[in-house]
């Protein structure tokens, strides 16, 4: 670490700068929907209870992602503030969930709320689900940041004078377009124990694609010291959400037991599109250490919120109640750790 650390030589050195961060983010749980349930008598209370299989039966694990920043310094403006243009990629998180359920008390009284009369689904005793969700974001921002004040002149014990950066708060303004993509897929497979799939089975698939285009409005507040910094950065982007969904269902039932199970086939496809209001917002709490004039290590904690999207488990239409099923009122929330570096040249 050099003895002399002036603001002119130590910070924002060079015309280009870049950053790379590894993200480890958790995702909010699915919209809760009951897929199947079976009533039973509680011998302790004498009351009726339900064994249920829902879309939130299993939690999500933390998924890795990345944030990459590439920026170009545009020099100072007439008020001596630093100007820059930067591109940021934020995303790469992919979440998967696999779950299953067997009716614990046989198949005589299993209720399927999402498809009470659909052949191949109603009356099933075995259920398997698969879920996938991902997130990616691209943004192009103009950044205007305050510079540190005048350097301090410090005399060493040997009588030599040296320049040192004066610590201070560095607010910044961030504005620019942002594009984000959220894709979700859900698949349900049903069967009966000991029965051939050709006699009884069902497969239901939901695909949801969301593209959000908005304008970033945000800022940054950094407490800059000679060799370390800490602060926060936040951005909010009101957006247009371009949503599309695709659903398919195929089922067959030719069993005669238990009585009352619908017989026949299920076979339908449904597509829908919509443009709706959306929102993208993120907040980062960060701290970093300047190792050299051109390189710093950084750690942080991140929050990310995406709203106005079609999440897969909000689109269930297996009973075909809606002609063009599409619910764009979904949202997802992410939070987790980040660590990486910043450098300039």
Where are these predicted regions, by residue range?
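Extracellular/periplasm-exposed beta-strand and loop segments of Gram-negative cell-envelope proteins
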Residues: 31-39, 46-61, 94-135, 182-211, ...
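Repeated loop/turn-to-beta-strand initiation elements of outer-membrane beta-barrel proteins
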Residues: 78, 150, 227-230, 294-297
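Outer-membrane beta-barrel "beta-signal"
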Residues: 330-345
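Residues on the lipid-exposed face of transmembrane beta-strands in outer-membrane beta-barrel proteins
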Residues: 20, 68-72, 140-144, 175, ...
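Transmembrane beta-strands of outer-membrane beta-barrel proteins
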Residues: 16-20, 81-87, 155, 169-177, ...
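Outer-membrane beta-barrel biogenesis signature
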Residues: 1-17, 146-168
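Transmembrane beta-strands of outer-membrane beta-barrel pores
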Residues: 24-28, 89-95, 146, 177-183, ...
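Short glycine/proline- and aromatic-enriched beta-strand/turn motifs that initiate or cap beta-hairpins
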Residues: 1-77, 81, 86-88
């Amino acid at each position: 670490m050099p003895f002399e650390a002036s603001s002119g030589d130590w910070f924002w050195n060079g015309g280009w700068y870049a950053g790379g961060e590894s993200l480890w983010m958790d995702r909010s749980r699915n919209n809760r929907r009951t897929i199947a349930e079976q009533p039973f008598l509680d011998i302790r209370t004498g009351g009726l209870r339900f064994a249920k299989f829902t879309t939130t039966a299993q939690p999500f694990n933390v998924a890795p992602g990345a944030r990459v920043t590439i920026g170009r310094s545009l020099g100072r403006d007439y008020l001596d503030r630093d100007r820059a243009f930067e591109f940021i990629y934020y995303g790469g998180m992919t979440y998967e969930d696999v779950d299953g359920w067997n009716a614990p008390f046989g198949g005589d009284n299993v209720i399927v709320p999402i498809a009470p009369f659909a052949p191949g689904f109603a009356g099933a005793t075995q259920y398997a689900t698969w879920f996938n969700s991902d997130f990616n974001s691209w943004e192009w921002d103009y950044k205007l940041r305050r510079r540190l004040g005048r350097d301090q002149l410090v005399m060493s014990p040997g009588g030599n004078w040296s320049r040192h950066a004066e610590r201070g708060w560095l607010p910044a303004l961030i504005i620019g377009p942002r594009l984000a993509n959220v894709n979700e897929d859900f698949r349900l497979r049903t069967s009966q124990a000991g029965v051939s799939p050709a006699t009884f089975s069902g497969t239901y698939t939901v695909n949801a694609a969301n593209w959000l285009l908005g304008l970033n409005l945000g800022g940054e507040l950094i407490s800059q010291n000679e060799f370390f910094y800490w602060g926060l950065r936040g951005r909010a982007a009101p957006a247009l959400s371009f949503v599309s969904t695709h659903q398919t269902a195929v089922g067959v039932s030719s069993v005669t037991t238990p009585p009352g199970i619908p017989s026949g086939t299920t076979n339908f496809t449904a597509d829908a599109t919509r443009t709706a209001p959306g929102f993208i917002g993120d907040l980062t709490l960060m701290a970093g250490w300047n190792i050299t004039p051109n390189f710093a290590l950084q750690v942080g904690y991140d929050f990310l919120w995406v709203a106005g999207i079609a999440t897969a488990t909000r689109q269930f239409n297996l009973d075909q109640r809606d002609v063009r099923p599409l619910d764009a009122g979904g949202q997802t929330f992410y939070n987790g750790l980040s660590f990486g570096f910043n450098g300039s040249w």
